[in-house]
Structure formats: C-alpha cells, structure tokens
Amino acid sequence: MKWTLAAVAAGCVASAALAQHGPIARARQVTASYTFDLVPSPDGRSAVLIRIVGGREQLFTMNMDGSGERQITREDADHEDPVWSPDGRRIAFVLVKDGRKVVTLINPDGTGAEAVTPANHSAIHPSFTPDGRAILYCTDDDLRPPEKNESEIYSIDLASKKVTTLISGGVNTFPVMSPDARKIAYRKIIGDMNSEVFVANADGSNPQNLTRHWTFEGWPAWSPDGKTIAYAGNRGNAGYQIFLMDADGGNPRLVAATEGRGTSPKWAPDGKTIFFTVCRESQERRGCDIMAAAL
C-alpha cells in the first residue's frame, strides 16, 4: 500500500494542562494500521518502521513519499526500537527471541546482521552517539516481576565492544545523546505513578529532572539543532500526547493533540516535522498508527 507522509495543518486547540504559546498541530494519520515507530533516515530520503506481519514485529524501509516499501527482517522473532546510524549505513534494533533481547545491527537492505550487546544484558532502547562510534542502551533484566526496580544505561563502543555504565540507580530508560554529544536525555521512573524526563552530562553525571510533573512523561527526542526536546506525557487526563520543551526544561508546550496513546516522537532531519505512534482502544500495537505533526 502506498501512502504519503503528509504535512499537517496547524490548529488552535486550547490546552488546560499547560500555558500554551502558539498553535497546536492537528496531527494527521500517515500510515495504515499495524505500523509504528517510524524513524526518518539522516538524509531525510527514507525511513525505517515496524509493521506487524504474521503476529511478529518486522522492520520495513521505504522512501519518504511512501514508495519502495521493503521488508528487511523475516526471522520468526520480534524486531523493536529501530534507529539509524548517523551516516545512514546501518540500522540498530532490538531482536527479541528465545527470551533474550539483543541490540543488533543490520544494513538498510537487511543484510549483515551483527549482535552488539553482551549476552549477560537484556538490552532495549538503543540509540547511536552522534559520531556513530557507540550505542547507548538500557537493560530490562530487573524490570520484570517481582523486581521492577532497576534499569541502568550503558554505552558500548562498536569497535572494541567495551561497555561503560553511564547511569545507574533506579529505573532509567530511553537514553538519547544530544547532537553536540554533551548531554544524555532519558526517562526515569519514580515510584509507581510517575516518570520524568531527565538530562545528565554525557558521562552520566549531574542528572537533572526537566519535566517535574506528577504524571508519566518519557520517550525524549532531541531536535536536530539540540535546542528542543520532544517527549510524550499524559498531562491533563487526555491520554499520552506529544509535547515540546526547551533543552533546559523551560517552555513546555503541547504540540500534537491526538485521540489515543501518543508516544515515541521522532524528528525529521530538517526539524520541521515530528512523527510519532498513536495506539487506540486496547493499546495493543495492532491498534497503532503512525502520525505526523508539522511544526
């Protein structure tokens, strides 16, 4: 099926949750069902996304006009959290198979699969450093019942395979490094009913809570210029929506008003569009679609 990653018109929907400055984008659905987690390539010409095929999460690539869609994974396993290398030559993702989660690299055509993370780590949420030499990830070993109390953030050097612990203590997920490689944004879960977007130095020092809100907030994504962070939150009792804030946590504002659970914001390379996933009804991924909001 061919579809277009269309721009969206700006709306003027008021938000009681935040002091809103400027219009809120009225997001438009840009894919059919059974798709989620679209990530534009660094050159903005193509994208990788996840589609449900035969009950499994498989990776596809395509041109940004929706043409040339191609399935690049076929293993009887789930393939999650895709992300492009900065040079666009590799795609990292999480291979979920036989109870293990391994960050894996492949070429954009699906060849050259290479496991990256060590066997003793159940690894999730990979992201590349801006120079492409390392991958950040976190572990979910202790996120399963009955523990649910520990998730550390690591970096792994792709040449030496040296693993460095960056952030520990509590549940820390979704790490992503700023374009200037000086900061790491991530989600930290605080208690049973709260998570926040934090930023720390690149070595994990000096963590700062940017969102400071009693609800759930997470899925941070740096803008290409590093001045803004997109994130998802459920402020205002309206389900998860997509927000922006300045890189220091100031000026939080709702950017996309949607029906359903909006998460996983991803920036277009030109910084003019945010793609994200919206799941409806049961919140199962079979009910998920990819949306776009023009800024």
Question: Where on the chain are the PLM-derived regions?
Answer:
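Positively charged n-region of N-terminal signal peptides that target proteins for export
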Residues: 1-4
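Bacterial N-terminal signal peptides
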Residues: 6-13
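C-terminal segment of classical bacterial N-terminal signal peptides
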Residues: 13-19
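Sequence signature of WD/YWTD-type beta-propeller architectures
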Residues: 19-295
